[in-house]
Amino acid sequence: MKPLILFYNADEGKINKMRPVLALMGIGIKIVGEEQLFNSVGFTAYPEEYENNPEAPSDVPRPDFEFMLLCGMDQKNMNLVLDFMKKNKHNIAVKAMLTDTNKDWSFIRLLNEINAERKMMAQQIK
């Protein structure tokens, strides 16, 4: 699997500033649009490798935060990406990795699970 980052609801300017460096690192970029939210996460990242088991579209809330999903990366590449982003102030607060657990979820489910975790953690901090 080629390393890849999926972006959802992220600022195009940020993505365009990161694009050349990510390309030099051999990391691809995909923008996840509204029409892909009900596709499985694995299929959205790697359609040639994963089967799609889409959910029926629904009125599930669409989170409004910027999100990036790191796919097919080892620890070294992930750290390089995160360090580059931090040094260059390309902040995307919500990040996750493609895992064996979430690869079969719909993208919208992943976003809403992460959003629920964020809210729960914020409550615990208070």
For the regions a language model picked out, list residue spans one by one.
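Phosphate-end processing signature that detects enzymes handling 5′-triphosphorylated RNA
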Residues: L24, G28-K30, E34-E35, N52, ...
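Short, intrinsically disordered low-complexity segments
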Residues: L37-L69
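N-terminal, charge-rich interaction modules
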Residues: M1-E48
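Noncatalytic linker/hinge segments flanking ATPase motor cores
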Residues: A45-E51, L69-K76, F107-A116
